[in-house]
Amino acid sequence: MHLARELGVNLADQRLAQALDEADPLAHLRQEFSIPQMKDIKQADLKLVEAESDCIYLCGNSLGLMPKRTRTIVNEELDTWATGGVTGHFPDGPGKRPWVSIDETVTDKCARVVGALPEEVAIMNTLTVNLHLLMVSLAHTMARQVPFYRPTSDRFKILVEAKAFPSDHFAVLSQLRMHGHDESALIEVKPREGEHNIREEDLLAILEEQGDSIATVLVGGVHYYTGQFFDLQRLCAAAHNKGCTFGVDLAHAVGNVPLQLHDWDIDFACWCTYKYLNSGPGGIAGAFIHKKHEGTSRPYLQGWWGVQLNERFRMDHDASFMPGVRGLQLSNPGVLQTVALLGSLEIYEQTDMASLRAKSLKLTAYLEQLMQALVNEEGHAPRFEIITPTDPERRGCQLSILFKVDIDAAFEALEKRGVVCDVRRPDVMRIAPVPLYNTFTDVYRFVTTLRDALNASASS
């Protein structure tokens, strides 16, 4: 980094991390979040760490930290419930956010994060529920009205990336079985022998060879295990060229990497909000259907929350449904879950995805360089390797570390030193410096702590 040269320090000098933090235009956003302290981490050994110092939290790819304002916002809704009961649903009730339209407090804000038109987004359910709804929803595709997955005798396969998140795998298999197909109709694109990431040209080749028999392509925007960020616009165009519907699981992409779902012509997408969008454990999810499907779309499965807002409480069986994805809403969303998401999205409104991405690229590059220096340390055979793509444009903030030594011993040693990250079996540790609240000093502390942990686990 050029700043290291300007300061006359090497990459491993803590002064570089401090200087990078001082120059960070988004540094103030950290104060918006509750950062657990060492004394709060049950696994931390307080003989090894300072009890009152912040823990090293690098697990926003699993669960984002709590925005401080979320407690206030949630308590406001509890107060509305306590003082108004059912009247909290209506504009003349005691609350400032009528529950009858509570999802509208977050829909537009979330649409900006994913690069969609407001009417293309619905906040509802959980990710896998939304995936099922989207796969059976009707849409006008290739000049015929079909669901995003309704197989025919000629076109019935589903193309996914190998080692997709298990819930996606289960959902897709169950869709196949529901339509009378078995696992042979599931095409999984795998990395080449000896590689960890999928070559997009291999996926494109499968599309070219088998596209006429593929009904739906479903990929994870950012792969949960390796951290690979797919070129969604390129893959979507190739899928459409072969007459396939293209959908995306954005669980590890939303709030992490820049997205332009509308401009990229994505057919459908779904995401959770408890990772980079910091809505809390089990938080409400999001769904997207491109506006091009709106004119000829009709919800395949329906519920009362998909009815036009001005008709919703008329309880009329002849009610008209909202167009597009909002017509897929089945039941009223949990108010507390919805406003928990609002707390985080208000912080996103203090910046933009371009600024967050710029910081993220620097944070993860700094982590990568420090980790690579640790790999190359004299006196040690390489104890791990980074399996996330080295191209910054093909990854988000996460680096996935494949351990060549005992990962359990290393992880336990990290926990004792107040590091919060996660392990995905059999031997990968995921490290995610989140630009909203992580610092360059967090990254520096992690790598120096990892060195200590590796040495401690090796000697134990």
Curated annotation (Swiss-Prot):
Pyridoxal 5'-phosphate binds at residues 127-128, 165-168, 249, 252, 274, 304, 332. The modification N6-(pyridoxal phosphate)lysine is found at residue 275. Pfam families: KYNU_C. GO terms for cellular component: cytoplasm. The keyword Hydrolase applies. Its EC number is 3.7.1.3. It catalyses: L-kynurenine + H2O = anthranilate + L-alanine + H(+); 3-hydroxy-L-kynurenine + H2O = 3-hydroxyanthranilate + L-alanine + H(+). GO terms for molecular function: kynureninase activity; pyridoxal phosphate binding. InterPro entries: Kynureninase (IPR010111), PyrdxlP-dep_Trfase (IPR015424), PyrdxlP-dep_Trfase_major (IPR015421), PyrdxlP-dep_Trfase_small (IPR015422). Keywords: Cytoplasm, Hydrolase, Pyridine nucleotide biosynthesis, Pyridoxal phosphate. Its main location: cytoplasm. The keyword Cytoplasm applies. Pathway: Amino-acid degradation; L-kynurenine degradation; L-alanine and anthranilate from L-kynurenine: step 1/1; Cofactor biosynthesis; NAD(+) biosynthesis; quinolinate from L-kynurenine: step 2/3. It comes from the Eukaryota. GO terms for biological process: 'de novo' NAD biosynthetic process from L-tryptophan; anthranilate metabolic process; L-kynurenine catabolic process; L-tryptophan catabolic process to kynurenine; quinolinate biosynthetic process. Gene3D superfamilies: Aspartate Aminotransferase, domain 1, Type I PLP-dependent aspartate aminotransferase-like (Major domain). Its cofactor is pyridoxal 5'-phosphate. It is found in: Cytoplasm. HAMAP family: Kynureninase (MF_01970). Catalyzes the cleavage of L-kynurenine (L-Kyn) and L-3-hydroxykynurenine (L-3OHKyn) into anthranilic acid (AA) and 3-hydroxyanthranilic acid (3-OHAA), respectively. This is Kynureninase. It comes from Monosiga brevicollis. The gene is kynu.
